Amino acid sequence: MALLPHFSTLGSGHTVLMLHDADGGHLTFAPQVEALASLGYRAVAWDMPGYGNSAPIEPYRFKGLAEACMALIDALQCGPVTLVGHGMGAMVALEVAVRQSALVRRMVLCAGGPALDAQAMADWVEPRLAALDATQGDMQSLAQALVPQFTGSGALPEGVRLATHALSQVYRGSYRRALQALSTFDRSAGVLGRLHMPTLIIGGAQDRCTPPAALQALAHVLPDARHLSLPHAGHWPQLEDPDGFDGALADFLASSRVLH
């Protein structure tokens, strides 16, 4: 039996499971873990396979990542859950929802989802792979060089520091495998259009990895989705503008809890 992914948890109530991006581990949701627990939710943030203390998987593809996430939900005996996915984690959330929609009550997709086209995916992945090669796998140097390129003009300095620290802790081999896996997400609009759970799509207006146009396109595909853009944030909205992000998240959870 495969080992369960490592996770942190705080609070009790309906489970909100947070799935981080390729650019960091569970720490990239640290502010939200505390905020959600204080609002009466059970906040869980995982380390994706190959990150933190979570065992890697081979092949490193969305099928295996989704299976690891579903195994964690099953082990926690907490389904259906709210999935909050950032970046690559948003794609994992979508893959889980496609494979086992009964496990997912609602979704929050943050700065992530299918790319508009191959060039958009290259714009996301290639600078990271180039930085990985240029720094010879020195993740601290990579993080210090990369994070400022993708944050917004109004980013909270503490959030930028946390994003930088989280990326510096990623294993270089896992980072490369995760980046290479990004382009393999192949769920079509027709498949995603069958996901009827309430969904909040939130991103930074200054995000050059997943720009507002990409998130708006995803919002048009999902039947029960709405899109929100935080004006001065980049690729880490939950860290760059935690007040704006947490407020939108809390409102969405409260309203969908009443309506659904």
Residue ranges of predicted features:
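Flexible "cap/lid" loop of the alpha/beta hydrolase fold
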Residues: L94, V98-R99, V104-T135
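Short beta-strand/loop motif that positions the catalytic acidic residue
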Residues: L195, I201-G203, D207
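Catalytic histidine-centered segment of alpha/beta-hydrolase-like enzymes
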Residues: A233-P242, D246
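Conserved acidic catalytic loop of the alpha/beta-hydrolase fold
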Residues: G64-V81
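Conserved alpha/beta-hydrolase catalytic His-Asp/Glu region
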Residues: A118-D123, Q136-G193
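Conserved HGGG/HGGXW glycine-rich cap/lid loop of the alpha/beta-hydrolase fold
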Residues: S8-A55
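Alpha/beta-hydrolase fold catalytic core
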Residues: M1-L17, S38-Y41, C78-G79, G247-H260
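Gly/Ala-rich beta-loop-alpha elbow adjacent to hydrolase catalytic centers
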Residues: G85, G89, A93
